[in-house]
Regions:
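Short, surface-exposed acidic
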Residues: 2-3, 59-60, 173-174
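Alpha-helix initiation and N-capping motif
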Residues: 26, 41-48, 157, 175, ...
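Hydrophobic alpha-helical segments and helix pairs
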Residues: 28-56
């Protein structure tokens, strides 16, 4: 899904075409997980994959889409991924399902945080029995790193800093810190 920046009133926002057609609906991961019996022995990540496949989604496509938003959330420091902002798209006529594209990354780029730093952070949605869920633990769930060309993102931190500077709401020092941390995340 191609995204672009636009102005909405007095705000700079990220926009895209509607990800749904008139005959599609979004089914949140929460709804998907509630519709399928829990399988003992599966961690919460694998439970999601199992449930989505049980609803008819292609398992490989779900795994890839999940990897995509896990990586994007880490790169952007998204602190608000939860079971209501990822899921499946279902065709209401054919009942075919596919993973939804990435959406709702509004709590990222250190928004709402005083310090822009490189510390790990509390991250959802997948919990573990071995400790507090964190961004680095979420990142370890990525199954296929060969799909990602992180070298292609070498200019991305500068582009982010430039776009944020257009809002004229950030001190240059904060923009520099965001740029530096994004570079380290890559």
């Amino acid at each position: 899904v191609p995204y672009s920046l636009a102005r909405s009133g007095n705000r700079l926002v990220c926009t895209c075409e509607d990800m749904l057609t008139s005959h599609e609906e979004l089914v949140s991961a929460w709804q998907v997980l509630q519709s399928i019996k829990t399988t003992n022995g599966l961690n919460s990540h694998d439970q999601w994959i199992h449930a989505a496949a049980g609803c008819g989604a292609d398992e490989r496509a779900v795994r890839d889409a999940t990897d995509d938003w896990l990586v994007v959330d880490y790169l952007m420091r998204n602190t608000d991924r939860h079971y209501n902002n990822f899921g499946l798209i279902r065709d209401i006529e054919t009942l075919e399902v596919r993973p939804a594209p990435i959406y709702d990354t509004g709590a990222s780029l250190w928004s709402g945080e005083l310090d822009v730093d490189g510390r790990d952070w509390f991250a959802k949605p997948f919990y573990t029995a071995t400790g507090k869920p964190s961004a680095l633990r979420q990142l370890r769930l990525v199954e296929d790193w060969s799909r990602f060309d992180l070298d292609a993102l070498s200019d991305w931190p500068d582009e982010v800093a430039h776009e944020l500077s257009r809002m004229r709401m950030f001190a240059p020092e904060r923009l520099d810190a965001i740029r530096d941390q994004l570079t380290k995340h890559i």
